[in-house]
Structure formats: structure tokens, C-alpha cells
Amino acid sequence: MSEIHLDDLDRNILRLLKKDARLTISELSEQLKKPESTIHFRIKKLQERGVIERYTIILGEQLKPKHLALIVLEVGKPVIEDFLERYISYISSTLSALPGVLFVAKSGEDKIIALVGKNNKDELVKFIEENITSIPNLKHIQIFPITEIKKGEDLTGFLAEV
């Protein structure tokens, strides 16, 4: 994939749309002091080049999970090492299907990172006990309750399910 070059106008359009994707071309034009045709053309080009993939929403506070935990799972190596990748894939897809699991990623060859969110602390603890700590063949589990988000507070509103 070739490197994407953005000029100041492209960056300003993206910055405004990231803040509020509901802005109309007319409103963008007014804020950026550029003709509507220019804004329309630039947005079309940004979409064609894959810079803008889609427009989405961020759920409000009422629908965001109130209690979050970042969980790091270290998977024990199976007797047949070739099965490690398949087992990690299986755990990842199983976790991804569970309600309240907002994010799942692989780290290194034997770790899985998951972000879990629930509406109350007891529900979160119960979920972790029933669904995470019960996974067989885990070498180590680290649970990091998130007490305060310093940057990226919209992330849970983006990832949360309805």
C-alpha cells in the first residue's frame, strides 16, 4: 500500500468529521472557508483513497459500560506446539463472541489481550470468573481494572454493543 499524502485541508476536514461526522458539506465549507464544491470533491477523494472508510457513531454515556477491565491471557504451550496458533485463534473467536467483550487482540505468539466492559462491578467480576478464568490451559492471567480513562474516552462508546 502506498503512503497517503494529506494536505492541510484534508487534515482539517478529517479533524472536523472525527469530532462530528454529522457535519454537512455546507457546514464544513463554512468552518473551513472553502467552497462547497472543493469540500465535496476532497471528501469524495478521501473516500476513494480509503482514507475515510465509513461513518459511524459513538454511543453516549447511558449505553457505555461503566466498569472496564483490560485482561492479558498468557496461553500455555500445548504438548503439540503446532496447536498453539489454533488454540489462540479459538480462544480469540470465543471471547469475541461474548457480550461485553469490546476488543480482542493477539500479542506475541502466546498472549491474548481483551477489553471487557459491564455496567456494574459485580457483573464484571462474575463475567471474568465465569468466562475468562475458566479457560483451560492458561499459563497466566493478568486483570487490570480501569479506574480512569485519561485519553480515548470515546473508545468505549465506539466499541460498546447495543
UniProtKB/Swiss-Prot annotation:
MF term (GO), any: sequence-specific DNA binding
PANTHER family linked to this entry: HTH-TYPE TRANSCRIPTIONAL REGULATOR PTR2 (PTHR43413:SF7), TRANSCRIPTIONAL REGULATOR, ASNC FAMILY (PTHR43413)
Gene3D superfamilies referenced in this protein's UniProt entry, alphabetically: 3.30.70.920, Winged helix-like DNA-binding domain superfamily/Winged helix DNA-binding domain
Name listed for the protein in its UniProt record: Uncharacterized HTH-type transcriptional regulator PF0864
Superkingdom to which the source organism belongs: Archaea
Cystine crosslinks: none
Gene source species: Pyrococcus furiosus (strain ATCC 43587 / DSM 3638 / JCM 8422 / Vc1)
The keyword Zinc belongs to this UniProt entry's keyword annotation: no
Keyword presence, Transcription: yes
Keyword terms, alphabetized: DNA-binding, Transcription, Transcription regulation
Domain HTH asnC-type: from-to ranges: 6-78
DNA-binding region residue numbers: 25-44
